[in-house]
Amino acid sequence: YCGVWGLRLSPDIAPVGDIFPLSPGYDTQGWLARSANDLLEVSTAVLGEAPPAGAGLWAGDLGLGIDPAVLAPIRAMALKCGAKEDPAAAELLRLACTEAATAYPVLGGAAAARVHAPWLDRRREAYDPAVWARLDAGRRRTAEELRAAEVIRSRVSEAFRAIFTRHHYVVLPATLGPAVTKAACDNGHRQRLLALNAPASLAGLPAVAAPVKLTDGLTAGVQILFPDMANFGWRSVLERLR
Protein backbone atom coordinates (compact mmCIF):
# COMPACT_ATOMS: atom_id res chain seq x y z
CA TYR A 1 0.00 0.00 0.00
CA CYS A 2 0.92 3.70 -0.26
CA GLY A 3 3.50 3.14 -2.99
CA VAL A 4 6.34 2.19 -0.65
CA TRP A 5 9.07 -0.40 -1.16
CA GLY A 6 10.21 -2.74 1.58
CA LEU A 7 12.64 -5.47 2.55
CA ARG A 8 12.31 -7.99 5.37
CA LEU A 9 14.92 -10.42 6.61
CA SER A 10 14.48 -13.96 7.85
CA PRO A 11 13.72 -14.20 11.59
CA ASP A 12 17.10 -15.74 12.42
CA ILE A 13 19.13 -12.62 11.62
CA ALA A 14 19.16 -9.23 13.35
CA PRO A 15 21.77 -6.81 11.93
CA VAL A 16 20.14 -3.77 13.57
CA GLY A 17 20.68 -3.59 17.32
CA ASP A 18 18.24 -2.62 20.08
CA ILE A 19 15.29 -4.34 18.40
CA PHE A 20 13.64 -7.49 19.65
CA PRO A 21 10.75 -9.47 18.15
CA LEU A 22 7.39 -9.44 19.91
CA SER A 23 6.61 -12.71 18.13
CA PRO A 24 9.90 -14.69 18.02
CA GLY A 25 10.25 -16.76 14.88
CA TYR A 26 7.72 -14.63 12.98
CA ASP A 27 8.57 -10.96 13.50
CA THR A 28 11.61 -9.90 11.48
CA GLN A 29 13.74 -6.83 11.00
CA GLY A 30 13.22 -4.86 7.82
CA TRP A 31 12.89 -1.36 6.39
CA LEU A 32 10.78 0.74 4.03
CA ALA A 33 11.80 3.19 1.32
CA ARG A 34 10.08 5.45 -1.18
CA SER A 35 11.85 3.99 -4.24
CA ALA A 36 13.78 0.98 -5.46
CA ASN A 37 16.94 3.09 -5.54
CA ASP A 38 16.48 4.15 -1.93
CA LEU A 39 15.85 0.56 -0.89
CA LEU A 40 19.03 -0.49 -2.68
CA GLU A 41 21.02 2.19 -0.84
CA VAL A 42 19.68 1.32 2.60
CA SER A 43 19.98 -2.43 2.06
CA THR A 44 23.56 -2.11 0.83
CA ALA A 45 24.47 -0.01 3.87
CA VAL A 46 23.01 -2.59 6.26
CA LEU A 47 23.64 -5.89 4.49
CA GLY A 48 26.53 -5.24 2.12
CA GLU A 49 26.59 -7.27 -1.06
CA ALA A 50 23.92 -9.75 -2.13
CA PRO A 51 24.17 -13.03 -4.05
CA PRO A 52 22.89 -12.98 -7.63
CA ALA A 53 19.36 -14.14 -8.43
CA GLY A 54 18.37 -15.90 -11.62
CA ALA A 55 14.81 -16.62 -12.68
CA GLY A 56 11.92 -16.98 -10.26
CA LEU A 57 8.38 -18.36 -10.22
CA TRP A 58 5.26 -16.29 -10.77
CA ALA A 59 2.89 -18.26 -8.53
CA GLY A 60 -0.36 -16.41 -9.25
CA ASP A 61 -2.85 -15.51 -6.53
CA LEU A 62 -3.01 -18.85 -4.65
CA GLY A 63 -6.55 -19.34 -5.92
CA LEU A 64 -7.90 -16.32 -4.02
CA GLY A 65 -9.69 -14.86 -7.03
CA ILE A 66 -8.00 -11.46 -7.12
CA ASP A 67 -9.63 -9.05 -9.57
CA PRO A 68 -7.98 -9.55 -13.01
CA ALA A 69 -7.57 -5.76 -13.32
CA VAL A 70 -5.35 -5.93 -10.23
CA LEU A 71 -3.67 -9.26 -10.91
CA ALA A 72 -2.57 -8.40 -14.47
CA PRO A 73 -0.20 -5.54 -13.49
CA ILE A 74 1.11 -7.61 -10.57
CA ARG A 75 1.90 -10.43 -12.99
CA ALA A 76 3.56 -7.95 -15.37
CA MET A 77 5.85 -6.75 -12.58
CA ALA A 78 6.67 -10.35 -11.64
CA LEU A 79 7.74 -11.07 -15.21
CA LYS A 80 9.74 -7.83 -15.32
CA CYS A 81 11.81 -8.91 -12.33
CA GLY A 82 12.60 -12.23 -14.02
CA ALA A 83 9.88 -14.62 -12.89
CA LYS A 84 8.54 -17.36 -15.16
CA GLU A 85 5.28 -19.26 -15.17
CA ASP A 86 5.28 -22.89 -14.02
CA PRO A 87 1.68 -24.09 -13.52
CA ALA A 88 2.69 -27.28 -11.71
CA ALA A 89 4.81 -25.41 -9.16
CA ALA A 90 2.11 -22.76 -8.69
CA GLU A 91 -0.48 -25.46 -8.02
CA LEU A 92 1.83 -27.20 -5.54
CA LEU A 93 2.15 -23.96 -3.60
CA ARG A 94 -1.58 -23.22 -3.76
CA LEU A 95 -2.47 -26.61 -2.31
CA ALA A 96 0.16 -26.34 0.43
CA CYS A 97 -1.00 -22.87 1.50
CA THR A 98 -4.76 -23.38 1.74
CA GLU A 99 -4.68 -23.34 5.55
CA ALA A 100 -1.80 -20.90 6.08
CA ALA A 101 -4.12 -18.12 7.23
CA THR A 102 -5.46 -20.45 9.92
CA ALA A 103 -2.09 -21.69 11.16
CA TYR A 104 -0.32 -18.33 11.35
CA PRO A 105 -2.50 -16.74 14.07
CA VAL A 106 -2.17 -19.91 16.15
CA LEU A 107 1.63 -20.16 16.01
CA GLY A 108 2.43 -16.46 15.75
CA GLY A 109 -0.12 -15.59 18.40
CA ALA A 110 1.23 -18.17 20.83
CA ALA A 111 4.79 -16.91 20.31
CA ALA A 112 3.70 -13.30 20.81
CA ALA A 113 1.64 -14.14 23.89
CA ARG A 114 4.72 -15.58 25.60
CA VAL A 115 6.53 -12.25 25.18
CA HIS A 116 3.54 -10.15 26.29
CA ALA A 117 2.61 -12.45 29.19
CA PRO A 118 4.29 -10.45 32.01
CA TRP A 119 2.18 -7.34 31.34
CA LEU A 120 -0.76 -8.50 29.20
CA ASP A 121 -3.36 -8.38 31.97
CA ARG A 122 -1.79 -5.57 33.97
CA ARG A 123 -1.71 -3.22 30.99
CA ARG A 124 -4.83 -4.40 29.20
CA GLU A 125 -6.22 -0.86 28.85
CA ALA A 126 -3.13 0.17 26.87
CA TYR A 127 -3.92 -2.33 24.10
CA ASP A 128 -6.34 -2.00 21.24
CA PRO A 129 -9.14 -4.42 22.20
CA ALA A 130 -8.73 -6.46 19.01
CA VAL A 131 -4.98 -6.82 19.57
CA TRP A 132 -5.46 -7.80 23.21
CA ALA A 133 -8.02 -10.41 22.20
CA ARG A 134 -5.59 -11.99 19.73
CA LEU A 135 -2.84 -12.15 22.35
CA ASP A 136 -5.27 -13.57 24.89
CA ALA A 137 -6.28 -16.22 22.37
CA GLY A 138 -2.60 -16.93 21.75
CA ARG A 139 -1.90 -17.82 25.37
CA ARG A 140 -4.93 -20.12 25.49
CA ARG A 141 -3.96 -22.30 22.54
CA THR A 142 -4.00 -25.99 23.36
CA ALA A 143 -1.21 -28.43 22.58
CA GLU A 144 -3.49 -30.03 20.00
CA GLU A 145 -4.09 -26.70 18.24
CA LEU A 146 -0.37 -25.97 18.18
CA ARG A 147 0.45 -29.42 16.78
CA ALA A 148 -2.15 -29.06 14.02
CA ALA A 149 -0.82 -25.62 13.08
CA GLU A 150 2.74 -26.95 13.07
CA VAL A 151 1.72 -29.61 10.55
CA ILE A 152 0.43 -26.85 8.27
CA ARG A 153 3.61 -24.82 8.75
CA SER A 154 5.71 -27.84 7.80
CA ARG A 155 3.59 -28.43 4.69
CA VAL A 156 4.06 -24.83 3.56
CA SER A 157 7.81 -24.92 4.23
CA GLU A 158 8.24 -28.20 2.36
CA ALA A 159 6.41 -26.83 -0.68
CA PHE A 160 8.67 -23.79 -0.78
CA ARG A 161 11.77 -25.97 -0.40
CA ALA A 162 10.67 -28.09 -3.36
CA ILE A 163 10.00 -25.03 -5.50
CA PHE A 164 13.33 -23.44 -4.59
CA THR A 165 15.17 -26.40 -6.09
CA ARG A 166 13.95 -25.16 -9.50
CA HIS A 167 13.35 -21.43 -9.01
CA HIS A 168 15.54 -18.82 -7.32
CA TYR A 169 12.56 -16.99 -5.83
CA VAL A 170 8.75 -16.94 -5.74
CA VAL A 171 6.59 -13.94 -6.62
CA LEU A 172 3.11 -13.52 -5.13
CA PRO A 173 0.70 -10.62 -4.71
CA ALA A 174 1.14 -8.90 -1.35
CA THR A 175 -2.27 -7.24 -1.42
CA LEU A 176 -5.69 -7.95 -2.88
CA GLY A 177 -5.80 -4.50 -4.47
CA PRO A 178 -5.34 -0.91 -3.31
CA ALA A 179 -5.73 0.06 0.33
CA VAL A 180 -9.29 -0.27 1.60
CA THR A 181 -11.20 2.13 3.83
CA LYS A 182 -11.10 1.80 7.59
CA ALA A 183 -14.65 0.45 7.54
CA ALA A 184 -13.58 -2.34 5.19
CA CYS A 185 -10.67 -3.39 7.42
CA ASP A 186 -12.71 -6.19 8.91
CA ASN A 187 -11.74 -9.72 9.88
CA GLY A 188 -12.65 -11.09 6.45
CA HIS A 189 -10.24 -8.69 4.77
CA ARG A 190 -7.57 -9.53 7.34
CA GLN A 191 -7.98 -13.25 6.66
CA ARG A 192 -7.57 -12.77 2.91
CA LEU A 193 -4.43 -10.70 3.47
CA LEU A 194 -3.11 -13.43 5.75
CA ALA A 195 -3.80 -16.01 3.03
CA LEU A 196 -1.37 -14.09 0.80
CA ASN A 197 1.24 -13.13 3.38
CA ALA A 198 1.21 -15.87 6.02
CA PRO A 199 2.96 -18.47 3.81
CA ALA A 200 6.21 -16.46 3.76
CA SER A 201 6.03 -15.87 7.51
CA LEU A 202 5.35 -19.52 8.28
CA ALA A 203 8.35 -20.54 6.17
CA GLY A 204 10.58 -17.76 7.57
CA LEU A 205 11.47 -16.41 4.14
CA PRO A 206 13.28 -13.12 3.48
CA ALA A 207 11.41 -10.92 1.03
CA VAL A 208 11.30 -7.77 -1.06
CA ALA A 209 7.98 -5.92 -1.38
CA ALA A 210 7.27 -3.53 -4.24
CA PRO A 211 4.33 -1.29 -5.17
CA VAL A 212 2.41 -2.02 -8.35
CA LYS A 213 0.69 0.89 -10.10
CA LEU A 214 -2.93 0.29 -11.09
CA THR A 215 -4.84 2.02 -13.87
CA ASP A 216 -6.66 4.31 -11.41
CA GLY A 217 -3.39 5.67 -10.02
CA LEU A 218 -3.56 3.68 -6.77
CA THR A 219 -1.14 0.89 -5.89
CA ALA A 220 -1.31 -2.77 -5.02
CA GLY A 221 1.71 -4.77 -3.88
CA VAL A 222 3.92 -7.66 -4.88
CA GLN A 223 6.18 -9.81 -2.67
CA ILE A 224 9.33 -11.55 -3.89
CA LEU A 225 10.29 -14.43 -1.61
CA PHE A 226 13.72 -16.06 -1.32
CA PRO A 227 14.74 -19.37 0.32
CA ASP A 228 17.13 -17.96 2.96
CA MET A 229 19.62 -15.19 3.65
CA ALA A 230 22.43 -17.05 1.88
CA ASN A 231 20.37 -16.90 -1.33
CA PHE A 232 18.65 -13.55 -0.77
CA GLY A 233 19.17 -11.94 -4.17
CA TRP A 234 17.48 -8.66 -3.31
CA ARG A 235 19.91 -6.57 -5.37
CA SER A 236 19.22 -8.44 -8.61
CA VAL A 237 15.45 -8.01 -8.48
CA LEU A 238 15.59 -4.39 -7.33
CA GLU A 239 17.94 -3.47 -10.15
CA ARG A 240 15.52 -5.06 -12.63
CA LEU A 241 12.56 -3.16 -11.21
CA ARG A 242 13.98 0.32 -10.65
Where are the predicted features?
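Structural helix-boundary/capping segments
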Residues: 1-63, 205-242
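Short helix-loop capping/hinge segments that flank enzyme active sites or metal/cofactor-binding pockets
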Residues: 105-154, 209-221
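Short Gly/Pro-enriched turn/cap motifs at secondary-structure boundaries
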Residues: 20-22, 105-108, 189-191, 197
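Conserved active-site and cofactor/substrate-binding residues in soluble primary-metabolism enzymes
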Residues: 2, 34-44, 69-73, 107-111, ...
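Acyltransferase
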Residues: 70-89, 117-122, 145-167
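Glycine-rich, small-residue loops and helix-cap segments
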Residues: 145-242
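Gly/Ser-rich, acidic/histidine-flanked active-site/gating loops
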Residues: 44-109, 139-140, 213
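Residue-level signal for inorganic ion chemistry
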Residues: 39, 116, 171
